[in-house]
Amino acid sequence: RQRRRRIKARRRIKRWRRRRIERRRWIEHATADR
C-alpha cells in the first residue's frame, strides 16, 4: 500500500513542479512591476 501511494505522490510532484515554475515566473513579473 505505501509503495503505490509513493508512486502517486511522485506523479503529483511532477505536475506541481511545472505549475510551480509557471507561478514563479508570474511572481517575478509581479515583483518587477512593483
UniProtKB/Swiss-Prot annotation:
It comes from the Eukaryota. This is Unknown protein 5. It comes from Pseudotsuga menziesii (Douglas-fir). The lineage of its organism: Eukaryota, Viridiplantae, Streptophyta, Embryophyta, Tracheophyta.
